């Protein structure tokens, strides 16, 4: 208390310094800061704030008698937020306070928390109901002596809160609910009225907080209800207006248990009390004093499933008869939300603007029509005034704000997509008045209509502009009659617009025969309330010169495309081009796009078949001396991807050229032969066929196109009588893609321009004669195309059949003349047989082959690299000191040394004495036997082990170990043998084999060579040689022959055995090594 006494003077002083006082009418728009102190609206004045998103009141709000304070949101995307959060602030209203969010698509927040709330005037909180709002007026000291309205245009799950929870409020006036559920959280005193109207609910949440029986709960319509939670002892509530199907109930099911409980409900006709018993138990019952005169047989148990309420199955009772006493209680004086100052003025302004535009036939700009959005709220409020209760003392002024702003578009050249959006907010009248050239004036008057308001019938008289092909167009006038109870609706008139508009393609070609379009359209808007017809007749003498199409010197060819039925009655003024072509493009199945992509054969298949669901937009427009016959037959559909992806060795060449539709016969029966040869002058540049139709003295010869169009200047016969075969010769695209050879990946995507056949068939015919505009837009095939030119007979009697029956479009992609880029990526293994010349050794792969014919090249060791050649398999060759490989110091295995046997030779007369151990020494060959391999026979044995030693060759020399030196490749070295060393041990020698390559070739030679110093030694190495550039070194040194090597995935390196391998030093060194190795066993025996 002491703190309050200290703080309160400072607070009052602060508010007095920063107070806002309004003495005269004021309208503020846009953002404004209200958090500056107390606000007082003095008598005779109002303050209307429009489109201020956040209004934070930090001081006391006082509205005096005959004053008003309004906060309104006209912008539908703006959510109002009005807050009073000062605990010492208060609200006192003796005039009108209205927080109006009926136009907002965002739920407004009205959170008024203060020390006290006293309403002696009218207080309105409203929302559109698109999103749940917040209705909360919380104060410890809460009094309503006037009118408090909580309104939603559409009910949501939001629950209104009045007073401080568990506290008390006094209601001596009227609390009126429109489309709103009120949740009682306080006790209620006073003798006022709480009215539920337009699908509203009074929800008594806690009967622990009593409601005085002098407080009347009124059900104003059949959709409203009362629900009480029966958690305490039964109480009695005064209810009026019960009947016509509205409901009273509790939050427990109304059941009657036979023999145990009481009936679910009972009505006492003498006292007028209706008792509802939850679960048939008396303690869970509530009593409703509904009045006398009710018939119990008309009572029925139902379920109240209103939004925001706990759904209780069979918890309510309705009365299926009229209210016996239908008088509205005297304390229930309800009104709907009034219009806010500053909004009704804008609505009347826009209404007068649209009315003026409808009478003077001027084109209302978009800025004027956009101003109609500001009238929605006012017209909505005026609508509610027409439906208020009969006993309302103050009828709401119905500001005739039904602003149907009339768009009258004067004749507009070119595409005019002017959207005549006449927004009418009062009732949901969607007046769609398209202008004659399909000016889509969808004036969607999306008003938020409260229930039981007068509905305006949307009489949208659409003015179908079927523009006749004569030189003078007179569209029929459209009469829009909207029977509205709101006010005078303005006249909508849309004058006929020349040129293509957004929806109807009425392209009128105005030529030198001056066509005068005189649209005399009179629109009559009639108001059912005023009973005062408003006629305004406009004669729009707009000679709309549509210079959008051809300026024909003597012909006026007007093609009118009304929706999809291409009536195209192109009446040429002096040239009689009567195109009787019914051009029946029958797409019986899929609309085949026939996109043949041929790289090379540029298939300028001009005759572009537009088979888009049989929409042959064959706009053959011969403008001036330019016969721009854009017969756009665009076979859109079946895209024929022609993938041709041959992956692997399979030549999968799928050349998908799928043309899975009909045969694309393109028969176009007419003399319009259009033999689409590859010599087609119609240069299909990026699918644009220039169809040069040279009209020399009337003979329009479409060279290369699907259209001959024989136009003669004087009597321009243009005789399209025939079959319009459109044979597409040259673009046949068989695309057989015979990938002869390897894997032939043939990823040939036929990149020839996708051949979408969108060739626009421009047909630039020179047509030196009369100018035939022939805009034949054959939609669905029945285009009449009567071009009455100079004498320009142009008898296109073609049935232009374009019969894409099933769209099979075989289109085999023959690629005749096309360059198929067969990319042929050989992904798999390829086995190739190669003839290797005599002095060349091919070192390929890691697989070792055996040289069967071992040449006796001089001093060549053909052994391989670092693998040790401990051939355990011994060559059983005999003969003393015979190498099976001949030549001076040649090894036959992979290269021979001098006197070396290619296999493992035996020592002095030893057979297969191959050392089982791997030959040691730096670079060892796996040879065995001193005095190697037997005589004249060949030691063809190959050691099974791989030759050891770094960089060893497998060559055998006479009396050599397999001694390979370090650093030997598997090539040929001088004086090396890849042969085998001495008999029983593995021969070691420092002699080097000339074999290069780090791979080792270890052949164990089991074959015996006999004979003295022959040039054979067919040692074959069975081991694998690996290392640098490993592989079988096949040397055809001795006998030239062909060696077949199996090639793996690795690269092939051709190693040429050098001629320098025959040097004398190597021969000597090899002989010395052989003798040394042969003597070692003798010494140690």
From Swiss-Prot:
Where is composition skewed (Gly residues) in this entry?
847-1010, 1018-1028
User: Which segment of the chain is annotated as a signal peptide?
Assistant: 1-19
* Start-end of Low complexity biased regions: 342-528, 539-828, 1031-1052
Report disulfide bridges, numbered on this chain. none
How does this chain sit within the bilayer? Lipid-anchor; GPI-anchor
**Where is the protein localized?**
Secreted, Cell wall; Membrane
Expression induction per the record is: Opaque-specific transcript. Repressed by HAP43 and induced by macrophages.
What segment(s) does the record annotate as region Disordered? Answer: 339-1060
What InterPro entries does the record point to?
Answer: Hyphal-reg_cell_wall_N
- Modified after translation how? The GPI-anchor is attached to the protein in the endoplasmic reticulum and serves to target the protein to the cell surface. There, the glucosamine-inositol phospholipid moiety is cleaved off and the GPI-modified mannoprotein is covalently attached via its lipidless GPI glycan remnant to the 1,6-beta-glucan of the outer cell wall layer.
Q: Which family would the database say this protein is a member of?
A: Belongs to the HYR1/IFF family.
Kindly provide the name given to this protein in its UniProt entry: Cell wall protein IFF6
Organism per entry: Candida albicans (strain SC5314 / ATCC MYA-2876)
């Amino acid at each position: 208390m002491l703190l309050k006494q200290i703080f309160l003077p400072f607070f009052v002083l602060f508010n007095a310094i920063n107070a806002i006082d309004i003495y005269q009418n004021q309208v503020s728009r846009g953002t404004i800061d209200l958090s500056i102190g107390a606000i007082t609206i003095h008598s005779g004045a109002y303050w209307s704030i429009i489109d201020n998103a956040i209004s934070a009141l930090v001081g006391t709000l006082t509205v005096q008698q005959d004053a008003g304070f309004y906060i309104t949101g006209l912008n539908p995307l703006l959510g109002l937020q009005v807050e009073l959060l000062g605990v010492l602030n208060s609200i006192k209203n003796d005039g009108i306070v209205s927080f109006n969010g009926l136009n907002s698509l965002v739920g407004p927040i009205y959170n008024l928390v203060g020390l006290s709330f006293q309403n002696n005037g009218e207080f309105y909180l409203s929302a559109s109901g698109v999103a749940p709002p917040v209705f909360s007026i919380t104060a410890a000291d809460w009094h309503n002596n006037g009118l408090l309205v909580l309104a939603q245009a559409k009910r949501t799950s939001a629950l209104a809160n009045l007073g401080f929870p568990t506290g008390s409020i006094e209601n001596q006036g009227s609390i009126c609910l429109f489309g709103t559920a009120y949740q009682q959280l306080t006790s209620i005193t006073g003798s006022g009225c709480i009215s539920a109207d337009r699908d509203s609910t009074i929800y008594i949440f806690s009967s622990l907080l009593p409601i005085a029986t002098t407080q009347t709960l009124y059900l104003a319509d059949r959709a409203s209800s009362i629900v009480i939670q029966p958690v305490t002892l039964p109480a009695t509530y005064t209810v009026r207006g019960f009947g016509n199907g509205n409901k009273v109930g509790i939050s427990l099911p109304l059941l009657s248990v036979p023999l145990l409980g009481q009936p679910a409900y009972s009505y006492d006709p003498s006292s007028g009390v209706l008792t509802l018993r939850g679960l048939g138990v008396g303690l869970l019952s509530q009593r409703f004093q509904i009045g006398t005169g009710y018939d119990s047989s008309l009572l029925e148990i139902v379920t109240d499933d209103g939004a925001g309420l706990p759904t209780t199955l069979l918890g309510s009772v309705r009365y299926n008869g009229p209210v016996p006493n239908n008088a509205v209680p005297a304390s229930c004086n309800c009104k709907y939300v009034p219009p806010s100052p500053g909004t009704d003025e804008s609505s009347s302004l826009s209404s007068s603007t649209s009315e003026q535009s409808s009478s003077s036939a001027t084109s209302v700009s978009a800025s004027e029509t956009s101003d109609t959005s500001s009238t929605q709220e006012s017209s909505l409020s005026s609508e509610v005034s027409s439906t208020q209760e009969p006993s309302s003392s103050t009828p709401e002024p119905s500001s005739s704000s039904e602003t149907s702003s009339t768009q009258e578009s004067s004749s507009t050249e070119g595409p005019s997509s002017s959207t005549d959006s006449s927004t009418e907010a009062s009732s949901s009248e969607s007046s769609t008045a398209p202008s004659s050239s399909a000016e889509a004036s969808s004036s969607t008057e999306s008003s938020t209509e409260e229930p039981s308001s007068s509905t305006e019938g949307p009489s949208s008289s659409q003015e179908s502009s079927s523009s006749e092909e004569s030189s003078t167009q007179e569209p029929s006038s459209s009469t829009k009659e909207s029977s509205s109870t709101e006010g005078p609706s303005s006249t909508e008139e849309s004058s006929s617009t020349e040129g293509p508009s957004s929806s109807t393609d009425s392209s009128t070609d105005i030529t030198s025969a001056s066509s005068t379009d005189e649209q005399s359209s009179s629109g009559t808007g009639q108001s059912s309330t005023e009973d005062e017809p408003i006629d305004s007749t406009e004669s729009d003498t707009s000679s709309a010169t549509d210079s959008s199409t051809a300026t024909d010197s003597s012909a006026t060819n007007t093609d009118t495309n009304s929706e999809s039925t291409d009536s195209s009655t192109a009446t040429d003024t002096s040239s009689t081009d009567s195109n009787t072509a019914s051009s029946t493009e029958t797409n019986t199945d899929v609309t085949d796009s026939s996109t043949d992509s041929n790289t090379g054969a540029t298939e300028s298949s001009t005759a572009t078949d537009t088979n888009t669901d049989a929409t042959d937009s064959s706009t053959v427009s011969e403008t001036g001396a330019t016969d721009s016959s854009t017969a756009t037959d665009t076979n859109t559909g079946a895209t024929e991807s022609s993938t041709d992806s041959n992956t692997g060795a399979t030549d999968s060449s799928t050349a998908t050229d799928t043309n899975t539709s009909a045969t694309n016969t393109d028969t176009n029966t007419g003399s319009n032969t259009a033999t689409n040869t590859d010599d087609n002058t119609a240069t299909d540049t990026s699918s644009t066929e220039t169809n040069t139709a040279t009209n020399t003295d009337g003979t329009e010869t479409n060279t290369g196109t699907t259209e001959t169009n024989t136009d003669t200047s004087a009597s321009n016969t243009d005789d399209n009588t025939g079959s319009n075969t459109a044979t597409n010769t040259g673009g046949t695209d068989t695309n057989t893609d015979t990938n002869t050879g390897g894997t032939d990946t043939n990823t040939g995507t036929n990149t020839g321009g996708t051949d979408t056949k969108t060739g626009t068939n421009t047909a630039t015919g020179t047509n030196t004669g009369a100018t035939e505009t022939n805009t034949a837009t054959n939609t669905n095939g029945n285009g009449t195309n009567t071009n009455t030119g100079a004498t320009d007979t142009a008898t296109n009697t073609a049935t232009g059949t374009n019969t894409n029956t099933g769209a099979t479009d075989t289109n085999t992609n023959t690629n005749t003349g096309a360059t198929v880029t067969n990319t042929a990526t050989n992904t798999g293994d390829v086995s190739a047989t190669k003839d290797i010349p005599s002095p060349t050794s091919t070192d390929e792969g890691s697989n070792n082959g055996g040289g069967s014919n071992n040449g006796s090249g001089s001093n060549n060791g053909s052994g391989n690299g670092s693998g040790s050649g401990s051939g355990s398999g011994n060559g059983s060759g005999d003969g003393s000191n015979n190498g099976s490989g001949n030549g001076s110091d040649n090894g036959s295995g992979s290269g021979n040394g001098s006197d070396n046997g290619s296999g493992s030779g035996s020592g002095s007369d030893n057979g297969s004495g191959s050392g089982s151990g791997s030959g040691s020494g730096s670079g060892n060959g796996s040879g065995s036997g001193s005095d190697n391999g037997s005589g004249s026979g060949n030691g063809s044995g190959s050691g099974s082990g791989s030759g050891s030693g770094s960089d060893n060759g497998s060559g055998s020399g006479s009396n050599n170990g397999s001694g390979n030196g370090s650093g030997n490749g598997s090539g040929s070295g001088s004086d090396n043998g890849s042969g085998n060393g001495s008999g029983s041990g593995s021969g070691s020698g420092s002699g080097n084999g000339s074999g290069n390559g780090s791979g080792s070739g270890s052949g164990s030679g089991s074959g015996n060579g006999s004979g003295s110093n022959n040039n054979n030694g067919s040692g074959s190495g069975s081991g694998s040689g690996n290392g640098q550039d490993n592989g079988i070194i096949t040397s055809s040194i001795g006998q030239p022959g062909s060696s077949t090597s199996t090639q793996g995935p690795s690269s092939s390196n051709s190693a040429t055995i050098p001629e320098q391998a025959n040097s004398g030093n190597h021969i000597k060194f090899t002989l010395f090594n052989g003798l040394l190795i042969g003597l070692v066993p003798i010494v140690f025996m």
